Amino acid sequence: MTENQDLCGSAQSESAENPRPSGAESDESGSEDTACAQAARSGEPSGAVSDDEQAACRLVDGCVRFDQGEPHRIVERVALEVPVSISFNGIYYNVLSCTPCDFEDIAYGVAYSAGFITSADDVRSVEVTQLTNAYQIDVILKTRGGFDYSSFMLSSISGVPIRDAEVRLPSYFPAHMVHIGPMSPIPPQAITAASNGLLERQGMHRRTGATHAAAFVDREGAFRFMSEDIGRHNAVDKLIGRLVRNRVDPLSGFAFLSSRCALELVNKLARYGIGVVATVSAPTSAVIDFALEANVTLCAFSRGNRFTVYTHPERIAIDCDGADDDEKRPVREV
């Protein structure tokens, strides 16, 4: 009996007949694994299942789905969630709960977001060790004079960065230190293309419904890189790590996130120098305030052929001359 076979006698598998919002992929893997892995990393859709994606999922037998009032026994594919410990130069940094794939990307991304590196050249090596029920990532960084990595240890209880066990570091990169270079406006069609194409490219989400995605999209709306993880922060860190490793110009496109428009996520992307961030869901006042000060163009509710620009609309190639008076007014507190 295949994993897509209904155990009560009918083929009611979610991946076969009732796909999650982003569709379903074939579970046939083999010679296409390498091509699929490359396609997944570049954001291209694929019918094959990569080795990374296979390792990041598990089959659960004995599930019961109620459909049209009728119960059906099925086998479901679920996303793996494992603890991953990261250390830098032999010093413990943090334990992440994440999807067990793309370890080098998340190592580079975390190092960049934490301010430990400014380019891929600052990393000497990344070693991944699989433990019984966890993973260990040991990152060796090229030393920078006067920089004390041990002062950036994380509290094992709260995960909040602390220095000398007393003075807390800022939880995000200060807006006044963000530098966004000049860039030509992004065509609005590129953002709607990303919105309409994201779910099609989320391989793990299509099979589990449990992952977030972070993508880097070019000015024509083509996906260049995409990362998935059960955690939205992990997905963004993996994307940043991939951009760092590939030395991608942050002004050559924009970031598109499947998650809520959270301050910490936009902050990490702005630190890399990305000037336009689009998300499928709502922003908060805090992220709007940060984006205004940091000179980041913030687009939210990016769904289908619609999106709302909250800050710095000059980076989107739109003409507001024909908009209603109410639409021309800047957003203000009431």
Regions found by a protein language model. Give the residues of each.
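Intrinsically disordered, low-complexity regions enriched in acidic/Ser/Thr/Pro/Gln residues
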Residues: 2, 8, 36, 43, ...
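Intrinsically disordered, low-complexity terminal tails and inter-domain linkers enriched
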Residues: 2-56, 321-331
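Noncatalytic linker/hinge segments flanking ATPase motor cores
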Residues: 125-129, 135-137, 167-169, 178-182, ...
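Protease-associated
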Residues: 211-246
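Active-site/ligand-binding-proximal alpha/beta "capping" segment
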Residues: 334
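Short alpha-helix boundary/capping segments
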Residues: 98, 227-231, 283
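Feature captures the catalytic cores and cofactor-binding loops of soluble hydro-lyases/lyases
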Residues: 232-321
